[in-house]
């Protein structure tokens, strides 16, 4: 996710000395940008709200419906919707049309947010994902039933809180056991480019879809090699 406040969201967030944007309580709805995906012919993966939350309590249902209308009219694109408020997403889920190209996710930074996962599991999206970024603690015994993708990443920028490698490996092992695609985004830190995004000497870019079967086959192949 972007670490800085873009011009589009100017006035909606302020920065602390750590460099992290903090929501100032004002909601700005960009109606002009809603139909832009309709003009994009080639397929794209679109992260709907990099610095916002579609299911914030101040966002009117009429606006949410318009966003979903556009997403349903663009089957060529994949829309990733991330929220920290899955309780509202679940509350209005039955009023929305969930096309296969609409992926619904929630943020899980620590185990204290496991209730978000349980709420997400009840939302009728074809793909449900977890964003464990920034990962701020271990996530043991994650409830992964009905979860189709897990993203993990460390916090970046000045004042970023460190992420332990054991936390990342713990999540990866759980994903492997449940055949859930695992995507490792970054180690983060003040110099995130230098820290890179390799885990155990390689990058992990698994995603839902055809790559799920590919990942299963690769794991089965690796297990058979170990047995031999």
PLM feature spans:
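Basic side chains
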Residues: 84-85, 116, 128, 172, ...
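Active-site beta-loop-alpha junctions enriched in small/polar residues
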Residues: 51-53, 84-86, 107-111, 133-135, ...
């Amino acid at each position: 996710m972007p670490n800085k406040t873009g011009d589009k969201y100017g006035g909606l967030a302020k920065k602390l000395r750590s460099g992290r944007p903090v929501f100032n309580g004002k909601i700005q709805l960009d109606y002009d940008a809603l139909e832009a995906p309709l003009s994009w012919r080639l397929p794209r993966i679109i992260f709907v709200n990099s610095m916002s939350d579609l299911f914030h309590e101040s966002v009117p249902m009429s606006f949410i419906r318009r966003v979903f209308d556009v997403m349903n009219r663009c089957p060529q694109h994949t829309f990733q919707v991330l929220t920290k408020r899955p309780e509202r997403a679940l509350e209005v889920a039955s009023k929305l049309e969930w096309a296969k190209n609409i992926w619904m996710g929630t943020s899980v930074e620590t185990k204290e947010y496991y209730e978000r996962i349980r709420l997400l599991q009840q939302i009728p999206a074809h793909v449900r994902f977890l964003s464990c970024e920034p990962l701020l603690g271990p996530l043991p015994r994650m409830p992964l039933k009905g979860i189709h993708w897990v993203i993990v990443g460390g916090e970046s920028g000045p004042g970023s809180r460190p992420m332990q490698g054991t936390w990342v490996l713990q999540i990866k092992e759980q994903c492997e056991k449940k055949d859930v695609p695992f995507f490792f985004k970054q180690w983060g830190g003040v110099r995130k480019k230098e820290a890179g995004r390799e885990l155990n000497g390689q990058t992990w870019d698994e995603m839902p879809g055809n790559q799920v079967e590919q990942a299963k086959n690769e794991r089965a192949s690796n297990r058979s090699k170990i047995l031999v």
